[in-house]
Regions:
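Glycine-rich phosphate-binding loop of ATP-grasp-fold ATP-dependent ligases
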Residues: 106-109, 128-154, 179-180, 202-221
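A long amphipathic alpha-helix within ATP-dependent nucleotide-binding catalytic cores
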Residues: 162-166, 204-262, 326-354
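ATP-dependent carboxylate/phosphate-activation module, predominantly the ATP-grasp catalytic core
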Residues: 183-238, 271-293
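C-terminal structural cap/anchor segments
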Residues: 248-301, 324-338
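Peripheral (often C-terminal) accessory segments that flank ATP-dependent C-N-forming ligase machineries
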Residues: 289-301, 315-374
């Protein structure tokens, strides 16, 4: 049994095994369940988007063998590792290892434990982002300035302090390009699976570029020297091996960005679950394999990989007829995007899908969500 549970981040933030995710999130999971075709198994033969107590309960109720499911202790570890302080720690590790970090963007993330420390840090940064310790996909984020505090902002901070124990505060930067590093943790080592470039709308995920690792690295190298990008990648891999090896198995997506000044901001967020960046890698690799005579990109597509960031296994399984529909021979490198669409009605969704090359998931007669290639 495979489960696409895009409400995973909400379940972690709530922390209760009895939490009921919003109906919109549940419908997204139902509409786009076919996206699990592009997800790799991890600690269980049952593939899930992200492990939490809610999805464990769903599997047990469906009759899954408990011996083939992760323990509650493991799920507690996943929740711990998903806290934003691990991204903060990863950033500190990268900065400490690079002698002259002139190419890095310092967003100076700080974990504030009191309202006074939140306010003083926002006053220091002048333009800041407030983030809930457990949140993702654009949720749990607020933009604030010292002169624009509202009662709603203060109430939100008080709620986060009460429910999650802290609030993450960081300098707000103007972003030129969002990207991520995609890793996969096995029982005994970390594999670097590739790069992903993504787009957001209002802090929420919107789309991924479908491109080879070589093409993406070329785009990233327009902002910073290739050797510096690969150095950061290797240091992030070192940190993940130290903090996650033996504690977690599965996909790890580390979000980063280049600022408008061309500086690299590492370790903005660590997604301790599957994510659309890894899906875009597998989608591109699979379609490129089918449409270019067997050539398959993968971790080795990024030159200079070594150690923890060495070559991982490329995924070149055959695509279904649906996935390949409408795509001509010679899959284009860096010219198409994988996009998530949300609509208020099935008719609106069908209209939005009119220009799609192919639909990877969703888009049924009553669906409000879809993942498609444009």
């Amino acid at each position: 049994m495979d489960i696409f549970n895009p409400d995973h981040d909400l379940c972690l933030a709530n922390g209760s095994a009895s939490f009921v995710p919003p109906a919109t999130a549940r419908q997204f999971g139902q509409d786009c369940s076919a996206i699990m075709e592009y997800v790799l198994p991890d600690v269980s033969p049952h593939k899930v988007w992200g492990w939490d107590r809610i999805v464990l309960g769903r599997l047990l109720k469906s009759g899954a063998d408990p011996s083939q499911l992760p323990s509650e202790a493991y799920l507690d570890t996943v929740r711990e590792l998903s806290h934003r302080r691990y991204a903060l720690s990863c950033r500190e590790y990268v900065f400490s290892k690079i002698g002259n970090p002139g190419f890095l963007c310092d967003i100076a993330p700080y974990e504030a434990m009191t309202m006074d420390s939140i306010i003083s840090t926002v006053n220091e940064y002048a333009d800041a982002l407030l983030k809930a310790p457990w949140s993702g996909s654009g949720k749990g984020i607020r933009k604030v300035r010292p002169d624009s505090w509202t009662a709603s902002d203060r109430g939100w901070c008080a709620k986060m302090l009460d429910r999650q124990g802290s609030v993450m505060v960081e300098r707000r930067q103007k972003v030129a390009l969002d990207f991520s590093l995609q890793f996969r943790m096995t029982a005994d080592r970390l594999l670097f699976e590739g790069f992903a470039i993504f787009e957001t709308q209002g802090c929420a995920y919107n789309a991924n570029l479908l491109a080879s690792n070589g093409h993406i690295l070329g785009l990233l190298s327009a902002y910073s020297e290739t050797k510096d990008i690969l150095r950061v990648r290797d240091l992030v891999g070192e940190y993940l091996e130290t903090a996650f090896l033996g504690r977690y198995r599965g996909v790890l997506g580390v979000d980063m960005f280049f600022s408008e000044e061309g500086l690299l901001a590492p370790c903005i967020e660590i997604n301790v679950r599957n994510n659309m960046g890894m899906v875009s890698r597998l989608v591109y690799d699979r379609l490129a394999s089918e449409y270019t005579g067997g050539f398959c990109t993968g971790a080795s597509g990024a030159s200079g990989a070594s150690g923890a960031s060495g070559a991982g296994a490329s995924v070149c399984a055959g695509t279904s007829g649906r996935s390949g529909a409408g795509l001509s021979a010679g899959f284009p490198d860096g010219q198409l995007k994988m996009r998530v669409l949300n609509a208020s009605s099935p008719e609106q969704l069908r209209s939005s899908l009119a220009g799609a090359r192919t639909i990877l998931a969703g888009g049924g007669p009553d669906a409000l969500h879809a993942v498609a290639i444009f």
